[in-house]
Amino acid sequence: MKSVKLYFSLLLSAVMLVVAAPVMAQDESAVAGEQNVEQTAEVAAPEAEAEAVMPIAEVEEGAKAAHAPISSEGRPNEDIDKEFSVGKAIGDFAGQSAIVAFFKDGGWKNALMLIISFVLLYLAIVKKFEPLLLMPIAFGMLLTNLPGAGLFHSELFAGGHVHWEDFALGSGVGLLDYLYLGVKLGIYPCLIFVGVGAMTDFGPLIANPKSLLLGAAAQIGIFVTFIGALALGFNYWEAGSIGIIGGADGPTAIYLTSKLAPHLLPAIAVAAYSYMALVPVIQPPIMKALTTDKERKIEMKQLRTVSQREKIIFPIAITVVIAILLPSAAPLIGCLMLGNLMKECGVTERLSKTVQNELMNIVTIFLGISVGATATADAFLNWNTLGILTLGIVAFSFGSASGVILAKIMNLFSKEKINPLIGSAGVSAVPMAARVSQTVGQQANPGNFLLMHAMGPNVAGVIGSAVAAGILLAFLPL
């Protein structure tokens, strides 16, 4: 019983101390404050006598401020007495929304770009025009043209350079600005090439080395269009970026354009992937116009079997030779051959599958949405875009025709005849161009099987477009 009484007495004492502590602290602070005021008054008295008397207006303003309502933050708040207006609140909300931006100067451009993005989404989803990349590009275009979203800021990359000081500050930098760094620094296209290499079989090219010439011939369209773009008033860097469309290689076009003419990137990317999707429409008329029915019926012998040793040596040898002769092409060629070596060596199957699937898919999403983000109204809605689309199809047509013409020339000196249709597969739209050669060949001769023969020039075109990009980078100073 005594212990219980002792416990309650101690508890009561503790409560009294807790209650009294703030009061004691206030008393001590008040005493200290009075001492400080007295000391301050003694020091400031001589100075106050020298100063003029406070104007009456300032005294009245101070009195008003003293009697003003106090906000929750302890500061005078004159607006707290004002009656809340629902109409004003709705007006303020509408002014902050993006709807108003469509009715301001230049707002119609954003609306038009949104319509273009809807059209591209339709082509990708319904018509299946290169949907794996055209759909992310279209959605990136949609995001960047939503007024007020602030996801992409082209001024951070003005002049073709990354303004790292703005990124360091972090304020005003959107999500797509960070993702676009992968395009600007050339990371995404190279990673795409690793995946392409892991999915490519160079066996038909190794079995028939002459098909390398057909792949090289198809790149003539790049340089013909380069000259044509110069004639139309584009500068050297812009002409080089436009010409690469003729290679029908999206990652290469994006890689080169991001280096030479980044302001043309959205138009060139859309043109490149659109024309790749239109290979079955563009190529057959050209192939039929340049060949006779007899030439289209030519049957080619079955290719020899290529050993695993040859498939392992090939990517290593190609990397060494091209990197020494043309260092500017080393990033693309090196990544392409790295992926192929993973596939062919037989000891990195897990890496090969990861590169072909997970890595390829993730990078494709980032690449597409980043490229689409650059398609702002100012960058896309101009006469240059129309010129790029026109020159792009010219480049693609010249590339397809050049391969067919070289195959016809080779038949003049070769004992074993080559079906000229496989020459059009020299553009690097893998494997669509090879399938078109097979389809047109079977229309003339149902028993003709050209697919594997056409795959030789087709994969050679992948190497050729990367080499052509390296040549342009070497001759055009950044």
Task: Show which residues each predicted segment covers.
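Low-complexity, proline/glycine-enriched hydrophobic segments characteristic of transmembrane helices
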Residues: 4-7, 16-106, 154-173
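Entry/N-cap segments of selected transmembrane alpha helices
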Residues: 107, 205-226, 376-403, 454-458
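Hydrophobic transmembrane alpha-helices of secondary-active transporters
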Residues: 120, 143, 180-206, 340-342, ...
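Flexible hinge motifs at transmembrane-helix junctions and intramembrane kinks/re-entrant loops
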Residues: 121-135, 139, 150, 282, ...
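Alpha-helical membrane segments and immediately flanking helix-loop junctions
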Residues: 184-185, 193-199, 214-224, 228, ...
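Alpha-helical transmembrane segments
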Residues: 263-281, 391-399, 422
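Membrane-embedded hairpin module used as a gating/binding unit in multi-pass transport
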Residues: 274-347
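Transmembrane helical segments that form the transport core of multi-pass membrane transport proteins
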Residues: 319-403
